[in-house]
UniProtKB/Swiss-Prot annotation:
Taxonomic classification: Eukaryota, Metazoa, Chordata, Craniata, Vertebrata
Domain BPTI/Kunitz inhibitor: 31-81
Major location category of this protein: secreted
Name listed for the protein in its UniProt record: Kunitz-type serine protease inhibitor textilinin-4
Organism: Pseudonaja textilis textilis
Signal sequence annotation: 1-24
Compartment(s) where it occurs, according to its Swiss-Prot or TrEMBL record: Secreted
Length: 83
């Protein structure tokens, strides 16, 4: 096999490893972050994944800032973090 073919194979294997979870309990690292209301004073109902309780919970988001553990729907939260 040529060196170009080996590099392509190595790249594909690396991509596959990154995209394939080890188990069904794996989730993105941001699912471990705490709920963060952000720096604004809004009153926006959102959901976050509570890693201690292994469930999606409602919180009030201020409308700006915060972190990635912030979902518009409970379904989006569950499919991202609790699947």
């Amino acid at each position: 096999m040529s060196s170009g073919g080996l590099l392509l194979l190595l790249g594909l294997l690396t991509l596959w490893e990154v995209l394939t979870p080890v188990s069904s309990k794996d989730h993105p690292k941001f699912c471990e972050l705490p709920a963060d209301t952000g720096s604004c004073k809004g009153n926006v109902p959102r959901f976050y994944y509570n890693a201690d309780h292994h469930q999606c919970l409602k919180f009030i988001y201020g409308g700006c800032g915060g972190n990635a553990n912030n979902f518009k729907t409970i379904e989006e939260c569950k499919s991202t973090c609790a699947a």
